[in-house]
Amino acid sequence: MNLKKVFILLFLVLAALWAGAQDQSYADCLTKTASKWGAPCAKCEYYKDMYKRDYSGTYQIDLQNVCSDMIEVKVAMEEKNGTWRTFPIKALGPKETMNAFACQGTGKYMYWVRRVNDTEILLPSDQEILTEYRSR
């Protein structure tokens, strides 16, 4: 009889662990690996003295998928004028990185993460981000 209780207890513990693994927060899979202020950015065209490119306000981050699952990521970077520069949803495999930037950044950024092909989690659209987080 005691052996039966042990097996039931073991089964319940394994079921709980398996259920917990299913509810993993994929936001924990994305880690900032680097950030840079004032580094050249080919996509930023801000000039001073009418002709010199000025990168002094650029803020760039590198984000890496540290999990073994493929994830989809949506990133937004805040510009000094209070708007958010959004980036298309990007799929990242294990150990893959992505770069995001703000040409006149504040240092604030946001990201949303889900497992690839997860239809239950909806990532926000650019319009939702621009409307919801305006001047925050």
Residue ranges, per PLM feature:
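Hydrophobic h-region of N-terminal signal peptides that target proteins for export
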Residues: 11-20
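Intrinsically disordered, low-complexity Pro/Gly/Ser/Thr-rich segments with frequent PxxP/GP/PP motifs
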Residues: 81-110, 116
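Terminal connector regions
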Residues: 30, 101-136
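Short, solvent-exposed loop/turn segments enriched in Ser/Thr/Gly
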Residues: 54-60
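Bacterial N-terminal signal peptides that target proteins for export
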Residues: 1-7
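Short, hydrophobic/aromatic beta-strand segments
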Residues: 70-76
